Amino acid sequence: MWELLAKGDPEVYEIVMKELGRQEEGLELIASENFVSPAVMEAMGSTLTNKYAEGYPRRRYYGGCKFVDEAEQLARERVKKLFNCKYANVQPHSGSQANMAAYLAVANPGDTIMGMSLSHGGHLTHGSPVNFSGKLFNIVSYGVDLETEVLDYDEIERLALEHKPKIIIAGGSAYSRIIDFKRFREIADKVGAYLIVDMAHFAGLVAAGLYPNPVDHAHIVTSTTHKTLRGPRGGLILTNDEELYKAINKAVFPGIQGGPLMHVIAAKAVAFGEALKDEFKEYQMRIITNAKALAKELENLGLRIVSGGTDTHLFLVDLNPKNVTGKAAEKALESADITVNKNTIPKETRSPFVTSGIRIGTPAVTTRGMGESEMKVIAELIVKVIDNIQDEKGTIPEEIREEVKKAVHELTEKFPLYKDLT
């Protein structure tokens, strides 16, 4: 596939090949990562990358947009069908930019926004002080009940009544339970707030009908197009309100972006088309089954799972009982070709760069075709590594590392990833 790259720039080609090898040989358990289809990849590498197309279909600031208009319109129509909504903007370059545009469509800098605390499972763009959201807006954070580790809706309502936010954000990057969007909308209506749902992590589950559709309750829904949706890296915004749609479009362009990435939008259209097929629902069902099985097996082997389990594609592991940090666990596992990410947890006492937990997700290994029996093997390998961590650097005995790495490679060889890309 990359013959011209190999000939024209051997250095970049070598990097691409090394990354391909890493993905093929390793176990990818980062919850926000997945493997796109070759068709999605081809669309991203198409001639559409050459075209500037500021504006929207049939309302561009450049000529020659006849065919990119078709690509964007196709992406819009497919995603509207996928999520049963009236209006869609598929131009955001990322989930973060989708969130920024959604906020600026209905609020002004200095307004109050309520979002889930990062340490409780939220996202940087939900009000972190180091993010644009925390710098532009007055932030009120909510979280989970520290005993049950699930959302405390009564406390969320109390905070909303006290602070009267302009926006309430629901959704997160590390929350493993089903979110009650109906309750969130009731709270928002009580204080006259806009409800914005960030479904970036569970969009694929929503598309498959395995997670409540936030479009039914939210004023605005944002998402990435990768993660469980298994498309290219990018963002999207949905709404059923025509006036909000107009405001969203202005916020995206000319508000925060210039020319859209038409090659990525075409790849989004391909991914949405794939998600409309029956086999996509079966795939999403396997993701959840695998996540539940992996969490349960890890628990059986002595690890503590935050909130006691998962309803989705991901879960958090509390490493405090093991006296191991998330940073050390991430490094140790990566040395054995298992990738996870360190993650803050409720009652967090460590820095976000160290953390007390790790986040684990099953979309990527499910894409490879792995099932419950493989989750049992993976759990055993994870625990073997964690139980043998010797220091904060994530050092493990060489014989353990090589034993686990060998088992990982034997497993991934049975479930090849991209057969025709080398």
From Swiss-Prot:
Catalytic activity: (6R)-5,10-methylene-5,6,7,8-tetrahydrofolate + glycine + H2O = (6S)-5,6,7,8-tetrahydrofolate + L-serine
Segment forming the signal sequence: none
Keyword Amino-acid biosynthesis: yes
Residues where (6S)-5,6,7,8-tetrahydrofolate binds: 118, 122-124, 243, 351-353
An annotated Gene Ontology molecular function: pyridoxal phosphate binding
GO cellular component, one term: cytosol
N6-(pyridoxal phosphate)lysine: modified positions: 227
GO biological process: glycine biosynthetic process from serine; tetrahydrofolate interconversion
Enzyme class name: transferase
Superkingdom of source: Bacteria
PROSITE patterns membership: SHMT
Location(s) in or outside the cell: Cytoplasm
Main localization of the protein described in the UniProt heading: cytoplasm
Pathway it works in: One-carbon metabolism; tetrahydrofolate interconversion; Amino-acid biosynthesis; glycine biosynthesis; glycine from L-serine: step 1/1
PANTHER family: SERINE HYDROXYMETHYLTRANSFERASE, SERINE HYDROXYMETHYLTRANSFERASE 1
Record's function text: Catalyzes the reversible interconversion of serine and glycine with tetrahydrofolate (THF) serving as the one-carbon carrier. This reaction serves as the major source of one-carbon groups required for the biosynthesis of purines, thymidylate, methionine, and other important biomolecules. Also exhibits THF-independent aldolase activity toward beta-hydroxyamino acids, producing glycine and aldehydes, via a retro-aldol mechanism.
Quaternary structure (record): Homodimer.
Family: Belongs to the SHMT family.
Protein name listed in UniProt: Serine hydroxymethyltransferase
Lineage of origin: Bacteria, Thermotogati, Thermotogota, Thermotogae, Kosmotogales
Gene (UniProt): glyA
